[in-house]
Each structure stands twice: as C-alpha cells, then as structure tokens.
C-alpha cells in the first residue's frame, strides 16, 4: 500500500469521480474510488460541450464517446395529437450556441460513465470498490482518515474527494452543517426520467416535447442509434407542496402514483405511452431540480468536484461539462502541489469559480422553466407559436438557450506520474 501522502480517496464513481481518478492517477497518486451502487442503470442524457471536449481528447476517449452518442438529430415540439408543430431544431455544435437543446455530443450518462470508468480502471494505480460507502471521516494535520463500509476499518489518505453528487456524503461529513444547509438552492422544477420501449411507427431520431397546462411536459428522446429504447422525462413546474414532499421522502411507489395522476390525461401517443412505461421501468428516478452553491469547494483535506460542489442543474445543460473540467483542474492542481493541498484546492477554486458561477445562471434570468413549461393553455399556444417562428425562419441557429457560451482558459498540467 502506498503511503498516505500519495493516496487519495474519491467517493463517487460517476463521470466526475472517474475523470478525477484518471487524472490523479496520471499525476502519480494512488487512487481508491468508492461507489455505493453495485450498478447504476438509470441516468439521463447528458451533453459534452466546449472545453470539456478538449479534455476528453487529452484522455484519448473522443472517438469512443462519439461512437456511443444517442444519435439524436434534433428536437421538435409536438401538439396535443403528437404531431410536429414545425420542423425540428437540429444539433448544436460543440463551440458556439443555438436554440437547440441537442448537442453535437449527446450521450446517456450510464454510457459516458462506463467509458470514463474503463479508462480509469485501466490504470495500475486506480482501484474501484463497489457497494462501498464512506461512513466516517476524521481530519488530521498531514492526512485524513476514512472508515469505509466494506471493511469497517479506518484508512489513511492524503485527501478525500467528494464526487458524490447533490446529496454528497463527503460534503455532509466534512463541511459545517449550516454551510451544507445553505448550499442547496431548490427550484420548483421536478423531473422523472426512465427508459421506455421504442415505437418504430412513431419514433424518429428527433426528440419530441409535448406540453399540457399546469406546467407539465413530456419529453421522449433517443437512447442510442438502434432505436429499441427511448429515454422519457416527465417534467413539472409547480410550487406544489405535495410534489416537494414526495420528491423528498416518498417511496418510488408514491412518486409513480403522483406522476400517474398528473400525466395520465395527456392526449396523443405520448401520454399513455409515458405513464405505462413509467410503471414498468426498472430505471425510474424522480427528483426536484436543485443547484449547489458554495463559497469554497474544500474543507481541510476534503474537496468537492462536480455536482457535489457546484451542481448547475439540468436547467443549464452544463452539469457534465463542469464535472469534466472541474475534475481535470482539481487533479492538475493536486499534481502540481502534492505537498501543499491547501494551495492546490485554493487554486482550483480561483481558476474555476467565475466560470462555474456564470455556468450556473439559468437562462432568461432564471425564468426558463416557467417559459418552457407554461401554466396555461394560452402560454402553451404562445410557446408553440414562438417555436414555429424560430423553426421556419431558421433563427434558432442564431440564438443560445443553454449551450456553453461562458469561456474558461484551462491550464496545461504536467501529469508526469503515468504516460
């Protein structure tokens, strides 16, 4: 076993954790990745945009990722009968923005995770421990100790990285409780996502979005180029306390029952298909959309990366991009200053804080969810009319509703540990 001064624990085996592990290993650290799930079948479609694409090139993974994209060719709004109201908006390029939500690199989270995990696990100084959680953390002057659930014994590390998402255990174990409480910024947007069977008579490579009043929407998108499955999203914009309570503490059965009641009345081919698919899905997940905002991304020898430290929420489309960029910079700064982690973590924050803050801005001054999911039939008519205008005129190519327009200069690091 390596001495604790070159041994790092990364909690979370998703994209943020796997990319962090990859670059830390390249920097000469011995990395242990703990992932609480034995498997994680669920996950939404995610985008890789801007400078994150440069990082996947550095990892040698660009072609594999491109080969695994969903094949989505654009997005269209459909009427109450499920018919397109106008031609679809096409894909957006990696650099620059359009009004399309479909990015050039659109991939399911589970597929992207597997690619990143495979790359990290291929390195000799990375170990993944599945079905394992971090139960206790104790900080010391020159090390940090964690008790891991698979052994129940304390283990020493030079640092612990929380790459464990919105409900980060590392954030809860190492940051002040009041700071933790204030870090969570909830919205009134809720989403359930799951897989449903494809319908060759109706489906195309284009995502389809249908609206109903009271802030409801159903979005169905390709999962892969085969077309045998689709990803389905049931979206609600509401200040309903019932939704908030069920999202927070309800069982999966409670959540499905509430969504069944809210979405069953959808007309056309999407409503019945979505609700029936929800009940049979084995990858169902329901959540309230929140952002995480902190004034510092580290506490002692514990640091946060990705959603654990600065989730921008799916409303911005920047979560995966921030996770990849954050992982690269965090690992790079640690490799540059392995004996002065306070300096490394402070530099990590200084380099990315402005970029993260601007990337967390929800479009239209935070009003995007209300505009995208109207409360009234009149609002839906206005949205569909607007969609027709930007589709038929091609104006959508000149607009930007969520692509990466905020730029960041990434340092070049000498990852000399492994070639």
From Swiss-Prot:
It is an enzyme of class 1 (oxidoreductase). GO terms for molecular function: FAD binding; monooxygenase activity. The keyword Oxidoreductase applies. InterPro entries: FAD-bd (IPR002938), FAD/NAD-bd_sf (IPR036188), FAD_aromatic-hydroxylase (IPR051704). Pathway: Mycotoxin biosynthesis. Pfam families: FAD_binding_3 (PF01494). Keywords: FAD, Flavoprotein, Monooxygenase, Oxidoreductase. Gene3D superfamilies: D-Amino Acid Oxidase, subunit A, domain 2, FAD/NAD(P)-binding domain. Its EC number is 1.-.-.-. The keyword Oxidoreductase applies. Belongs to the aromatic-ring hydroxylase family. KMO subfamily. Monooxygenase; part of the gene cluster that mediates the biosynthesis of cercosporin, a light-activated, non-host-selective toxin. The perylenequinone chromophore of cercosporin absorbs light energy to attain an electronically-activated triplet state and produces active oxygen species such as the hydroxyl radical, superoxide, hydrogen peroxide or singlet oxygen upon reaction with oxygen molecules. These reactive oxygen species cause damage to various cellular components including lipids, proteins and nucleic acids. PANTHER family: MONOOXYGENASE (PTHR46865:SF2), OXIDOREDUCTASE-RELATED (PTHR46865). This is Monooxygenase CTB7. The lineage of its organism: Eukaryota, Fungi, Dikarya, Ascomycota, Pezizomycotina. The gene is CTB7.
């Amino acid at each position: 076993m390596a001495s604790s001064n070159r041994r790092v624990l990364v909690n979370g085996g998703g994209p943020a954790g796997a990319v962090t592990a990859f670059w830390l290993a390249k920097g000469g650290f011995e990395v242990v990745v703990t992932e609480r799930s034995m498997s994680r079948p669920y996950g939404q479609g995610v985008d890789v945009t801007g400078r994150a694409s440069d990082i996947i090139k550095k990892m040698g993974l660009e072609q594999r990722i491109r080969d695994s994209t969903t094949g989505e060719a654009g997005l269209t709004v459909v009427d109450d009968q499920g018919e397109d109201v106008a031609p679809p908006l096409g894909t957006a390029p990696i650099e620059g923005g359009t009004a399309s939500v479909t990015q050039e690199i659109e991939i399911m989270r589970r597929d992207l995770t597997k690619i990143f995990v495979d790359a990290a696990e291929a390195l000799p100084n990375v170990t993944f421990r599945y079905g394992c959680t971090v139960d206790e953390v104790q900080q010391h002057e020159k090390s940090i100790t964690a008790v891991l659930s698979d052994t129940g014994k304390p283990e020493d590390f030079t640092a612990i990285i929380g790459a464990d998402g919105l409900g980060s255990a590392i954030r809860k174990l190492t940051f002040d409780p009041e700071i933790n409480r204030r870090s969570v910024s909830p919205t009134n947007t809720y989403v359930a996502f799951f897989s449903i069977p494809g319908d060759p008579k109706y489906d195309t490579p284009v995502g389809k979005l249908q609206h109903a009043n009271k802030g409801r929407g159903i979005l169905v998108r390709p999962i892969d180029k085969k077309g045998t499955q689709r990803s389905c999203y049931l979206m609600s914009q509401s200040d309903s306390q019932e939704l908030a309570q069920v999202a927070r503490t309800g069982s999966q059965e409670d959540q499905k029952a509430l969504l069944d009641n809210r979405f069953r009345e959808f007309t056309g081919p999407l409503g019945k298909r979505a609700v029936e698919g929800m009940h049979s899905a084995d990858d169902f997940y329901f959540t309230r959309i929140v952002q995480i905002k902190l004034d510092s991304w580290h506490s002692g020898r514990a640091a946060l990366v990705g959603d654990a430290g600065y989730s921008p929420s799916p409303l911005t489309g920047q979560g995966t991009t921030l996770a990849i960029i954050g992982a690269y910079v965090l690992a790079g700064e640690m490799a540059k200053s392995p004996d002065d982690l306070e300096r490394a973590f402070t530099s990590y924050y200084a380099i990315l804080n402005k970029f993260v803050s601007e990337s967390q801005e929800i479009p239209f001054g935070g009003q995007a969810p209300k505009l995208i999911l109207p409360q009234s039939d009149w609002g839906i008519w206005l949205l569909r009319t607007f969609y027709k205008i930007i589709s038929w005129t091609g104006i959508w190519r000149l607009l930007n509703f969520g692509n990466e327009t905020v730029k960041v200069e990434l340092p070049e690091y000498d990852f000399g540990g492994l070639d």
